[in-house]
A protein has these predicted regions:
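Acidic catalytic patch
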Residues: 65-74
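Conserved alpha/beta cores of soluble small-molecule-handling proteins
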Residues: 2, 28-31, 47-49, 70, ...
Length: 216
């Protein structure tokens, strides 16, 4: 069995989709004001004095707490449709080639899974989330050709709480989540693709690792 595990932001895309999604969903003015408000926290994060996942949680909560999940999902789908140009052609070629060979493809991303999944509609025949998201019938739950492992959002009474329902899928959490889906490590060949510090553990786990691929 062959598994190809792709990081999303920076590996398959040319930009960080959290930043782009907030700008798309909230508008440039609200985006700039929100990040200005959190500037001290972001500086501390860059200096490794404040945890990445906490900064991400606070920023996400600032922009999306209280939004209906239906509206959020619609924004996710529309964002992906409007931003397919962010996907690197070489990454798409590698992903399609793996699928066409019958290999298993997994996207392992720190980004919110609800906006990652729609980027791949029309690229893979069937797409699933490791969290079994209640998306439309265009994302069947059986015989996945492509699975998305990402950070999931928490909801209450149909609205975003501003918190995440899973750990931030970053660093060692990427390995933990991948092995939870495919625990029999000795029985498959793993090829991994990543571009940042958050992918180190995933790349170290792989039989074959590609660091910062698809740049040419």
């Amino acid at each position: 069995m062959n598994i190809h595990a792709f990081d999303f932001d920076g590996t398959l895309t040319t930009r960080d989709t959290l930043i782009e999604f907030i700008r798309y969903a909230c508008g440039t003015r609200a985006f700039l004001l929100g990040f200005l408000r959190h500037a001290p926290l972001l500086v501390l994060m860059k200096l490794h004095l404040y945890p990445n996942y906490r900064a991400k949680q606070r920023i996400f909560s600032h922009f999306f707490r209280g939004m209906s999940i239906d509206r959020f999902d619609a924004l996710c789908a529309n964002f992906a449709r409007a931003n397919r140009h962010l996907l690197r052609p070489g990454g798409l070629d590698a992903l399609r080639s793996a699928i066409n060979r019958g290999d298993t493809v997994v996207i392992v991303s720190a980004s919110v899974d609800r906006w990652v999944i729609p980027f791949f509609t029309g690229i893979a025949d069937t797409i699933t989330s490791s969290q079994s998201l209640p998306f439309s019938t265009s994302l069947p739950s059986t015989s996945p050709r492509l699975t998305v492992i990402g950070t999931s959002v928490e909801t209450s009474a149909g609205r975003l709480t501003g918190r995440f329902s899973t750990a931030n899928c970053y660093g060692a959490e990427k390995v933990r989540r991948l092995l939870a889906l495919y625990p029999d490590r000795a029985n498959y060949h793993l090829t991994a693709y990543g571009d940042s510090r958050g992918d180190r553990e995933l790349l170290a786990l792989a039989d074959k690792a590609h660091y910062k691929p698809f740049r040419h």
